[in-house]
């Protein structure tokens, strides 16, 4: 996925705790992801795939963040991920990470780079 960028319209207007999904096509296959606004981490973006079984985290409802525990969560397995780096700190994929995407702001929009970021 090197060099691919996608504009996520309006993502810079998200309030803390809100997310917006996006989908990129790579080799005619959908690559789903999400941008999340976090109170301290700002805008972060990850691919919508749990490292445990490579399934969507949100079960299709577009909600990824649990404010009461300050974690991104997988609704399939209950895995919890730190917002700032995507590392699982609870659940079946402990120590594994979500695939992070780079985010650049441009006005009210965000450009998401689907090149893997560490």
Functional labels for PLM-detected ranges:
Residues 1-67, 82-83, 97-118:
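N-terminal pre-ligand scaffold of iron-sulfur
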């Amino acid at each position: 996925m090197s060099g691919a960028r996608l504009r996520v319209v309006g993502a810079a207007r998200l309030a803390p705790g809100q997310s917006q999904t996006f989908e990129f096509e790579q080799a005619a296959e959908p690559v789903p992801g999400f941008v999340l606004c976090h109170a301290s981490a700002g805008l972060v973006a990850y691919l919508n795939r749990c490292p445990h079984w490579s399934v969507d985290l949100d079960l299709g409802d577009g909600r990824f963040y649990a404010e009461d525990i300050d974690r991104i969560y997988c609704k399939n397995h209950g895995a919890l991920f730190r917002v700032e780096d995507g590392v699982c700190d609870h659940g079946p994929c402990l120590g594994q990470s979500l695939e992070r995407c780079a985010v650049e702001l441009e006005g009210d929009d965000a450009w998401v780079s689907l090149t893997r970021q560490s």
